[in-house]
Regions:
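Active-site neighborhoods and metal-handling regions in enzymes and metal-associated proteins
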Residues: 1-596
Length: 596
């Protein structure tokens, strides 16, 4: 079926069920950022493949809302379909809430699958549409009804992550969460975020492409821990190990009937912004629900000493693979055919040569020339183009290792570049270096520091439409909260204090539509600096070990202090990486890290 035919079939279903508007978010049942193939309902109904966006279908309109990262891609993919693009955050573009408020008439019905909408979002919709007396149909998976060849729910094998890698036993983590639960004055903790469950239980899976998580729900009280999963994914030895730590396994879908049996005097702690609305509405009304961020969120984000040391090893391996790849690319571009897709395959080959490599941490972005301006471009057979010995290629890639997760962007010069490309290449790099070198008082958040990265671009009246940085998981999701670098805070994302052990990306960029894109990204770990009469100061230490391309830099634009920062970083890269290279690669790296 084409997108047009699918929308026609959905509208027929809506008519039969008395639903006037149907909301299709990107989410799975766990509020995951990236979702398994079974859950890709929004992609199915609109044809848009980006990782963020929400569709609204009515009898006379179909709309897709997405953010600045995806404006170009969405416009291309929606062409020729009945779906209108709503560019979130742009002037005169209504939010989904505003749109529904204005377009749903009194007494109409809004439908969605309550398992794919958070309790918080469902409550917000109810409040907004209350005065129109809009009613809700939240138990219908209408896309599932029309999707004939829908993939099955994933059930990939589960592995245990040993203490050697995790740095802490699951028993120790469970004790910490039980004590936090007690502090909150609650009896039960309901956890549905997949990466939090994997972190807490020291297990990893493969139920979402590039995200080593296990489809699961978890309920913990002071004596029991119930895990709702597909038991087939667990070997006997993993089940035995979990059982030893007091973890009982139940069927995945049983969570909905289980929560109906929670005794009325109990207090349940959960995160309404994470737990889906069907699950929360299944809890008896007499049960007290305490809402707050997941008790696992901060302990997971603050990496322990073992994790930090392991991550340094992961980044050393990744640096070796990246340096070998960039050397190979520069040597061969123009000599043999290299495309965006074949370059990604070659990089995978270099990473695979590293011990304990587990796979990509996200789909690689190898974006040549004008493709670089599409922030989250992902080459397909249709869009794939050859790399030529001129201009820039933006490469945002990462790997999972038993020692941790990497995420790196390098913009590589393949041949002659324009003055404009050099100007912005240098401005973005200056911002990156300024943020990486920040020293700040304990208590600062990413909001306090973001302008350091944007400063050089802001001075030119320029900017980029994405956050400057995100947290990164340990052999988990490459985008992990709660910390970030951004210049304004959405109400839903409180800005947490930057703590020692947090790993965050530093990735300013610049995008000239239809021309080129530039992004420079390292991961940095937050460390304690000195303590003075003003209190504790903090700093960042780089984890990523790959040179920035000197051929893209105009040293005249840089202040002496910025050149010094770059030279120090490059000397550090050479010292760490060169022992793992052959002679030819070593002499190339020597030149690539020379002082400017």
């Amino acid at each position: 079926m084409t997108v047009t035919e699918r929308i026609t079939a959905l509208r027929k279903q809506m008519k039969e069920k008395g639903i006037d508007a149907y909301l299709v978010p990107t989410d799975d049942f766990h509020g995951s950022e990236y979702v398994g193939d079974y859950f890709k309902c929004r992609k199915y109904i609109t044809g848009f493949t980006g990782s963020a966006g929400t569709a609204v279908i009515m009898q006379d309109m179909a709309g897709l809302w997405t953010d600045g990262r995806y404006f170009i891609q969405a416009a291309q993919q929606l062409e020729g379909t009945p779906v209108t693009l709503f560019k979130m955050g742009e002037p005169d573009v209504p939010t989904i809430h505003k749109f529904l408020e204005e377009n749903l008439k009194e007494g109409m019905c809004l439908g969605f699958d309550g398992r794919t909408v958070s309790a918080e979002e469902a409550e917000t919709l109810e409040k907004i549409l209350q005065k129109k007396q809009v009613h809700f149909s939240v138990n219908e998976d209408l896309i599932g009804n029309i999707w004939d060849d829908r993939p099955a729910l994933s059930c990939e094998p589960v592995m245990e992550l040993s203490e050697k890698w995790a740095g802490r036993s699951r028993a120790d983590k469970i004790r910490e969460i039980r004590s936090k639960l007690k502090e909150k004055g609650a009896d039960l903790f309901i956890l549905t975020s997949l990466d939090d469950i994997a972190w807490l239980l020291n297990i990893r899976g493969n139920d979402i492409h590039c995200c080593p998580v296990v489809l699961s729900y978890l309920v913990l009280d002071d004596s029991e821990l119930r895990l709702f999963v597909n038991e087939k994914a667990f070997s006997d030895s993993v089940k035995e190990a979990l059982s030893k730590d007091g973890i009982a396994i139940y069927p995945y879908d049983d969570i909905y009937t289980y929560v109906q049996t929670i005794p009325e005097e109990k207090k349940v702690f959960l995160s309404r912004s994470n737990v889906n609305s069907r699950l929360v509405s299944s809890i008896p009304k007499t049960v007290t629900i305490l809402d707050g961020e997941n008790l696992t969120l901060l302990p997971k984000a603050i990496k322990n000493e073992t994790e930090v040391q392991n991550e340094k090893t992961a980044h050393l391996k990744d640096g070796v693979a990246m340096v070998k790849f960039i050397h190979w690319l520069k040597k061969n571009v123009g000599m043999k055919e290299i495309t965006e897709l074949s370059a990604a395959d070659k990089l995978y080959e270099f990473r695979s040569g590293q011990e304990n490599f587990q796979g990509n941490s996200f789909d690689p972005i190898i974006a040549y020339g004008a493709h670089g301006a599409i922030v989250h471009y992902s080459a397909t057979e249709e869009t794939n183009i050859p790399l030529e010995p001129k201009g820039l290629v933006l490469m945002d890639t990462g790997g999972h290792y038993l020692e941790g997760t990497t995420d790196i962007t390098r913009t590589v010069v393949l041949g002659p570049v324009t003055e404009k490309e050099k100007k912005y290449f240098t401005a973005v790099l200056r911002g990156h270096l300024n943020l990486a070198a920040a020293k700040f008082r304990y208590g600062c958040t990413g909001l306090n520091l973001d302008a350091l990265a944007r400063g050089p671009l802001w001075a030119m009246g320029e900017d980029y439409n994405h956050g400057t940085g995100h947290g990164v998981g340990y052999l988990l999701n490459v985008h992990e909260g709660p910390q970030s670098f951004r210049w304004k805070s959405p109400a839903a994302l409180p800005a947490p204090v930057l703590e020692e052990g947090m790993i965050t990306s530093d990735e300013p960029g610049y995008y000239a539509e239809n021309e080129f894109g530039i992004r420079h990204e390292n991961l940095v770990v937050c460390k304690k600096a000195e303590k003075t009469s003003y209190g504790q100061f903090m700093k960042f230490e780089p984890l990523t070990l790959v040179p920035f391309d000197l051929e893209g830099i105009d040293p005249e634009q840089m202040e002496a202090g910025e050149r010094k920062l770059l030279n120090q970083y490059h000397a550090f890269v050479y010292e760490k990486i060169s022992p793992y290279l052959n002679e030819e690669e070593q002499s190339w790296l020597k030149k690539a890290t020379q002082e400017i």
